[in-house]
Amino acid sequence: MEALVYTFLLVGTLGIIFFAIFFREPPRVPVKDKK
């Protein structure tokens, strides 16, 4: 059970960090708008 808990915590932490960076610095690759 410890492996499951550690995996969940790791994924949660990585997700929070990823979303924090993503929302703080919006992606600069507007491919769809560029025609």
Curated annotation (Swiss-Prot):
InterPro entries: PSII_PsbT, PSII_PsbT_sf. Keywords: Chloroplast, Membrane, Photosynthesis, Photosystem II, Plastid, Thylakoid, Transmembrane, Transmembrane helix. One of its GO terms (cellular component) is photosystem II reaction center. GO terms for biological process: photosynthesis. It is a single-pass membrane protein. The keyword Glycosyltransferase does not apply. The keyword Plastid applies. Signal peptide: none annotated. It is found in: Plastid, Chloroplast thylakoid membrane. SUPFAM superfamilies: Photosystem II reaction center protein T, PsbT. PSII is composed of 1 copy each of membrane proteins PsbA, PsbB, PsbC, PsbD, PsbE, PsbF, PsbH, PsbI, PsbJ, PsbK, PsbL, PsbM, PsbT, PsbY, PsbZ, Psb30/Ycf12, at least 3 peripheral proteins of the oxygen-evolving complex and a large number of cofactors. It forms dimeric complexes. Found at the monomer-monomer interface of the photosystem II (PS II) dimer, plays a role in assembly and dimerization of PSII. PSII is a light-driven water plastoquinone oxidoreductase, using light energy to abstract electrons from H(2)O, generating a proton gradient subsequently used for ATP formation. This is Photosystem II reaction center protein T. It comes from Chaetosphaeridium globosum (Charophycean green alga).
